[in-house]
UniProtKB/Swiss-Prot annotation:
Name of the protein: NADH-quinone oxidoreductase subunit H
Transmembrane segments: 5-25, 76-96, 118-138, 162-182, 190-210, 243-263, 284-304, 319-339
Complex and partners: NDH-1 is composed of 14 different subunits. Subunits NuoA, H, J, K, L, M, N constitute the membrane sector of the complex.
Protein family membership: Belongs to the complex I subunit 1 family.
GO cellular component, one term: plasma membrane
InterPro entries per the UniProt record, alphabetical: NADH_UbQ_OxRdtase_su1/FPO, NADH_UbQ_OxRdtase_su1_CS
Length: 350
């Protein structure tokens, strides 16, 4: 029994990591296609049909490039930096429910690597470790411009993590759990949390742009300037890891938003599908529905990048500390008042 459980979870973990890598890889292709569409161009169309093999070509190019080490006494940290940035994005996917279950080989297979009752706390803990990957890489590069970019990125991520965490408190007050599986099950049908916590969703969405260093919060790396930010001194696959980590984080952020606020794998009529069509068909459709929601938010990230200009650094900090954090606190107070009123009414029999 234990060996079967270990095999089952190992397969689920491998599949989840593989899907995360593939989605992040093809997000680079989608980014270039969306940019081409908005700029009235064709985009990548040489490697494979419609440029579908372009991510593989980019990976081979990065892999074959020369390894460059700057004049730094911290070679080990120089290598560890991009590894931390990449691994944190992958580790977050372990607690996400990708579907309900599949009935295979006479047993139910849960479509989640692990269901822990502190999943949200785990996600915030892992995401906060990603700051170290950026800071270590910028500091170990022995380049003042890389260090400045790393300090900017770290201060931005830490600042917006506060507002993001506060926005989640209001949601947790309503759901009463940190388990992403339970939160998904509570949103069966169209009972989505975004209808009950629209302000939490808006704050979380804005903070997710800052957490992933996406435009208009990409002050750490200015692509149209000579200095590329904290990864200026990186080349080959180490550079690729930093770039790949951004797209992996974008995919994970889109998944978390879909699960927390838009029902995850749930869709209207899912229980009817289970009763009349079968568990496997209904839950496979649920997986497809989840990925449709994820792709929508990935497209939204890309659309914003090519339509909204970058903030100044003071505007970035003012938005985080003077607007989003106070709004999050007000949202907590409103949510608490509504819950208290509901409890009092229930106690009095109204």
């Amino acid at each position: 029994m234990e060996s079967a459980f270990i095999i089952e979870k190992s397969v689920v973990i491998v599949v989840v990591f593989a899907v995360t890598m593939i989605m992040a890889m093809y997000s680079t292709w989608a980014e270039r296609k969306v940019a081409a569409f908005l700029q009235d161009r064709v985009g990548p169309n040489r490697a494979g049909w419609g440029g579908l093999l372009q991510p593989l070509a980019d990976g081979m190019k990065l892999f074959s490039k020369e390894e460059f080490f700057p004049n730094t006494p911290n070679r080990f940290l120089f290598v560890v930096g991009p590894a931390i940035a990449m691994s944190t994005a992958l580790m977050t996917s372990a607690v996400i429910p990708w579907g309900d279950r599949l009935h295979l080989f006479g047993k139910d297979i849960i479509l989640q690597a692990t269901d822990v009752n502190i999943a949200l706390l785990y996600i915030f803990g892992v995401l906060s470790v990603g700051v170290y990957g950026i800071m270590i890489g910028g500091w170990a590069s022995n380049n003042k411009f890389s260090l400045m970019g790393a300090v900017r990125a770290a201060s931005q991520m830490v600042s917006y993590e506060i507002a993001m965490g506060l926005s989640m408190i209001a949601l947790l007050m309503m759901t009463g759990t940190m388990s992403l599986k339970v939160i998904s099950e509570q949103q069966a049908g169209m009972n989505w949390n975004v209808f009950y916590q629209p302000l939490s969703f808006l704050i979380f969405l804005i903070c997710s742009f800052a957490e992933t260093n996406r435009t208009p919060f990409d002050l750490a790396e200015c692509e149209n300037e000579l200095i590329g930010g904290y990864h200026t001194e990186y080349s080959s696959m180490k550079m690729g890891f930093y770039l790949f980590a951004e797209y992996a984080s974008m995919f994970i952020s889109s998944t978390i938003i879909s699960v927390l606020f838009f029902g995850g794998y749930n869709y209207p009529g899912m229980q009817w599908m289970v009763d009349n069509v079968g568990v496997n068909t209904a839950n496979l459709l649920g997986i497809a529905v989840l990925f449709v929601k994820i792709c929508f938010f990935i497209f939204f990230y890309m659309w914003v990048r090519w339509t909204i200009p970058r903030f100044r650094y003071d505007q970035l900090m003012n938005l985080g500390w003077r607007i989003l954090i106070p709004l999050s606190i007000i949202n907590i107070m409103i949510t608490g008042a509504v819950i208290l009123r509901h409890d009092i009414a229930a106690a009095l029999g109204f």
